Amino acid sequence: MNHVNKAKELYKQGFYCSQAVFAAFADELGLTEKQALQVGSCFGGGMCKGEVCGACTGALMVLGMKYGRYKADDWDSQMKANDMAIKFLEQFRSENSSYICNELLGCDIATPEGKAYAREQKLFAEFCPKMVASAVEILEQLSK
């Protein structure tokens, strides 16, 4: 199963956007799916506050695992990771108008009213999977 389909399937199962994106890459990152799902569990819904889209934070976790530093003095890796993160966010915003969850959804999901609106409009069921797919597609483009 390719990354896009894996992420969409995980999202469809009920995992957050952040979990779906990050876990779709678990194998190649040397993680179990369980580990990736656990790590991504607090980032969905714009970190539960409608902030940076969880699909984006999941993607940034993938980039951090691929390019980030694990030694304090490895600034080359840190700069590469930062560069990739900036490229990702710029591309995501270019394709989707924003990378802020509330802006993408057009409502404040940190409020009961906003969350109810998102459910009524089927945004979580129909719009968010598109953001998950977009994030994964951009990750794949950047990895070429």
Regions found by a protein language model. Give the residues of each.
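Active-site-proximal helix-loop elements at catalytic-domain edges
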Residues: 1-29
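A short glycine/serine-rich beta->alpha loop
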Residues: 5-12, 42-51, 120-124
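Short cysteine clusters
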Residues: 17, 53, 101
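Acidic-glycine-rich active-site phosphate/pyrophosphate-binding loop
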Residues: 22-41, 107-112
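Short glycine/serine- and small hydrophobic-enriched flexible loop segments
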Residues: 23-27, 61-68, 137-141
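Phosphate-handling active-site elements
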Residues: 28-38, 65-84
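Conserved phosphate/anionic-ligand binding catalytic regions in large, soluble enzymes, centered on
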Residues: 47-61
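C-terminal binding/interaction regions
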Residues: 81-144
